[in-house]
């Protein structure tokens, strides 16, 4: 409990974007901010009626002075209420970062798979990639419609900056369902020797992993992040 209090920092909300797929909130610290690693999550509490209850969300962007961004999909009562009520200037507390979803400790060849708003940790991952990155990383970002994609400018910037990183935007409305067979065909390396990093709906993860096992292409390591906070 003391550690949680120590990690809790006051923030001001500086920007709110109501994107078709998510409510994107930017905030800056009042004083010392948190210093999370890419892919971490934080517990936030917004000082506005109906939004004070603490909820955990993955941090989709980390700034040099402790600034943070959250990209939050309306999955339940709280997140839909947040979309309706949150405003620039609102005060919030941010506690974190937490979690073990950390690509930096992974294998040389990595497949990142994002389903919908599950892109959030991968946005922070991509921001952290540099020209010196030696891994080969393939990101398959699955959305239903093109307008649901979040942060494409940041992902494409990472693709230009880092020669080992490649983005594949899979739009299921036009490209069809993302099956294990389709996924395996997109990968430029041996999946059986690679690491898989997944964030998205649990049924999607189960179907893909089951399919990859049947294909004899089950990854050497599997890491996944739960994000369906309501």
Task: Please place each PLM-identified region on the residue numbering.
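Ferredoxin-reductase
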Residues: 4-93, 143-147, 156, 172-174
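FNR/FR-type flavoprotein reductase catalytic core
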Residues: 1-7, 74-230
């Amino acid at each position: 409990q003391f550690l949680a209090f120590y990690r809790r920092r006051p923030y001001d909300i500086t920007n709110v974007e109501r994107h078709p797929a998510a409510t994107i909130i930017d905030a800056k610290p009042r004083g010392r901010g948190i210093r999370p690693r890419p892919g971490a999550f934080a517990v936030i509490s917004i000082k506005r009626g109906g939004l004070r209850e603490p909820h955990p969300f993955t941090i989709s962007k980390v700034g040099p002075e402790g600034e943070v961004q959250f990209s939050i999909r309306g999955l339940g009562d709280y997140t839909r209420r947040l979309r309706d009520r949150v405003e620039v200037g609102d005060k919030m507390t941010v506690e974190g970062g937490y979690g073990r979803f950390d690509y930096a400790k992974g294998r040389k060849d990595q497949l990142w798979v994002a389903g919908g708003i599950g892109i959030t940790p991968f946005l922070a991952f991509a921001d952290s990639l540099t020209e010196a990155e030696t891994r080969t990383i393939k990101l398959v970002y699955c959305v239903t419609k093109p307008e649901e994609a979040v942060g494409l400018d940041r992902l494409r910037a990472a693709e230009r900056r880092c020669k080992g990183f490649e983005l594949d935007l899979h739009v299921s409305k036009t490209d069809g369902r993302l099956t294990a067979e389709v996924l395996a065909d997109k990968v430029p390396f041996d999946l059986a020797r690679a690491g898989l990093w997944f964030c998205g709906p649990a049924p999607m993860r189960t179907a893909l992993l089951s399919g990859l096992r049947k294909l004899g292409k089950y990854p050497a390591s599997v890491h996944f992040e739960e994000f369906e906070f309501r």
